[in-house]
């Protein structure tokens, strides 16, 4: 992942619709005479799907439901009772396929860039709030607008918690990413299944902890970084930290295996 590839123009006819007003096909990286490091492509463009490309689209009849937009449809795979709704898994599969197409053309730049997008979606699918919106006994309460705002703030709070752990260079979190060994999975579908099922199994404890820590705040406003700092100073984040280490470790292990296998398949790794 530490080699350089030449930046190439986007030349693909895709079946996937984007918000063209917020989709940039030019390069964002700091290149070196038209060349860019592969690790830099993966790091830079793994955030690209959150920059607006999936917003403002009419892609699913499920957008009829309150609080559901095209970004939600493409970045989540929500389980309600025994039903799995939305297209987060298809987003991952799609960009894995596009990456393979690019590598088959010897277009390494777009091979890595499409792969970076794929990694974004599998990371989304590893997160509890991208797989569940609430416990099944309370899911009908999402019809209430105030309760939907509360749940969105819960989701945002957990996203911010991950950012908090990275900001403080939490050693256990970094160890979970760096030192978890690859966990085998036979293909992309099994990868998605194993990552999602583990995430779903941890949803209730994550959700309960977020509510326990910040319930009074969440009914009024979004949680802020300083709220985590205060809670951490009081030793109140330990349960949330431990379950998060488990979620991240599971994601890291499965993704490492997938990447190694994928890189061999496209002949980027011996």
Label for each model-derived stretch:
Residues 1-104, 113, 131-270:
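N-terminal, motif-rich segments that launch catalysis or mediate targeting to/interaction with membranes
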Residues 110-132:
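Active-site alpha-helical segments that house and flank conserved acidic catalytic motifs
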